[in-house]
Regions:
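Gly/Pro-rich turn-and-neighbor structural signature
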Residues: 2-83
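Serine/threonine-rich low-complexity intrinsically disordered regions
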Residues: 8-10, 93, 138
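Context-gated lysine
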Residues: 2, 12, 86-87, 118-121, ...
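Compact, glycine/acidic-enriched structural inserts
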Residues: 119-145
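Internal mixed beta-strand/loop scaffold within catalytic domains of large alpha/beta enzymes
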Residues: 53-126
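Generic alpha-helical propensity signal that fires on short helical segments
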Residues: 36, 114-118, 144
């Protein structure tokens, strides 16, 4: 099976950006595994939308259960270049979920995406949050307006 990527130049550029970020994060998380965990790396799993015809993605999943309770760094690109009924041209995204076993380390969720309509109008969305398991009042004061 083979993934077919979106045809538009901006979707291709967005995919290159989020794939670069994905590898950056996976390399850093693997370095943490080597230093503090079981030295196991994140495993890559590829998936396909409609058999790859409308894209798909690559997910790196944590395999070290001494450091990460749950972890994945996902890149996906779904497109409908061949479907005149759809207004969406493509959606390209990096989504990350990292939950540590250490309760003093906050969980991290991040989503960076490029969405492009067939009218060629597109937009970036970026969101992230840190979710501490144990309250730290001085840190709360730093992040609260």
């Amino acid at each position: 099976m083979k993934r077919i990527f979106a045809a538009s130049a901006t979707a291709k550029e967005a995919n290159a950006i989020v794939e670069h970020l994905q590898l950056y994060f996976v390399e850093r998380l693997n370095a943490l595994n080597r230093e503090f965990g079981e030295t196991r790396t994140f495993d890559a799993v590829e998936w396909y939308r409609d058999g790859g015809r409308h894209g798909g993605g690559l997910r790196y999943m944590a395999t070290d259960d001494s450091l990460f309770n749950r972890g994945s760094v996902n890149v996906s690109q779904v497109h409908y270049d061949d479907d005149a009924e759809k207004k969406l041209g493509s959606a390209t995204a990096l989504s990350t979920i990292i939950h540590s076993f250490n309760p003093l380390v906050p969980s991290i969720h991040m989503h960076i995406s490029w969405t492009e309509m067939k009218s060629t109008k597109g937009y970036w969305r970026i969101m992230a949050d840190l979710n501490p398991a144990i309250e730290n009042k001085s840190a709360t004061q730093q992040f609260t307006a």
